[in-house]
Amino acid sequence: MSELVLGPLLRYVGEREATIWVETDCACEVEILAARTPTFEVDGHHYALVRVEGLEPGTSTPYEVHVDGECHWPPAHSPHPRSVIRTSRRGSPYRVIFGSCRVARPHEPPYNLARDQDPRAKEVDALYTYALRMTTRPPEEWPDLLLWLGDQVYADDVSNGTERFIASRRSTDVPPGPGVANFEEYTRLYLDSWSDPLIRWILSTVSSAMIFDDHDIMDDWNTSEAWVAKIRREPWWHERIVGGFMSYWVYQHLGNLSPRELDDDPVYRRIAAGEDAGPMVRELAERSDRDVGAMRWSFHRDLGPARLVVMDSRAGRVLDEQRRRMVDENEWDYIESHSRGDFDHLLLATSVPFLLAPGMHHLEQWNERVCAGAWGGLAARVAEWIRQAIDLEHWAAFDRSFRELAELERSVASGEHGGPPATVITLSGDVHHAYVYEVAFRRDGRASENGKERAAVYQAVCSPMRNALSSTERRVMMFGQSKPFTAAARAMARAAGARDPEIRWRSVDGHGPWFNNQLATLELDGRSAQMRIERPTPGDAGPPQLEQLAERRLA
């Protein structure tokens, strides 16, 4: 009898349609709400993306998953509420939770202890704790979207089960050691990361959107041209990167697409017609590694009163030192064109933050200039070592793209492409702490081009879901935000020929940063926007609880 291995994951949800992703143990037919889809096969693994259509806007519809006619979801005697599809309605209120960086570990000691208590500790899982609270609250208080902003899995810090699986297949005494080596090992990592019953339930009933960052492939992936040249000399790298792209396409990317976009996707269209998926997905992965323009991973969604544009800020980097870009020109055209329109809020999501603490921004500016030869060849080699050692690879380290994104936000916020939205908010993860910056533009005030008040502009960062920093790492981070460090870094950047940015930013109300496992919630209702950040705390002889760290009205 066919079995459900992983899922269901509720992925795309619009006003009248939804997609639901599953993995099964063999070729079969999957049925959800009378929609039937045959599985496709990739290297011995079987998947289906079921398209459910004909739903009504603004409704909640319970569903079951049938595999070859047998009900496999919900599990028998499940203690959790029923899985539902909650469709959106244009202009209606919308609740987004977002975060990044979640390692898969058991929810018990020593893994849920404080980082400084045990070297194996990852503290309490924020997503697990959020899901636990959801089960006790009415559906109208549930989020509409879970936005994953990178490092959904850690290919170089694998789960206990994945490490045992790898050790049963090959020696971990030689590279890549206990890290993932190929597609087969990635499938086990995703299984361990998403199969906890409570995590499985929240993923079945809250729509999700995802974009990868470095740890989905490897720490520091695509940091620089020199990093790529060095890693490609490793004999194990080809299968690692191909397996990473293959698994990302199957487990994450497909569900980001709307039904219409699936119809336009040449690979998925051939798979849906019955062609063998494995060779096609592998060929796509190999092209994606060698050609940044081979695949557009960025995507967009309309969320109630908002437009969400999720930008790939990892795979599509142009790394030539003389023409570095965070995304290539074609992908940037897509981002620009989908950031314009008639909506109350523009949400621009990027795994790595657009705005860092000012001192770190100046340091990355300095580093990019010196790596490109501003101080000569020897200094360039030293700067490259520094870049890789302390991860100087955010938008500030791609100055051309930084200025393009700043100009895009300014033009949208000031109403140059129509009426200005109420907010323009950049959502990010990656840096293992949380903060909210408010942004001001040097060239204009609060008035927009058409006389209306300009949109409020913010950078909101929330990280990690589960991979908190140690106390020593936190002190280093705080030093990078100090006034002496900022002054020194700015002087270095200017000495290397970098220009000050055209925007200014500061912490909202002077609060933050917060160093915890945490999740952020963004609530949109018409032209109002409210944000809060919560962290999980161990329960007193009971389950973990969420504690509010900050709440702020953004518009």
What kind of feature is each model-predicted range?
Residues 1-555:
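Metal-dependent phosphoester/phosphodiester hydrolase catalytic core
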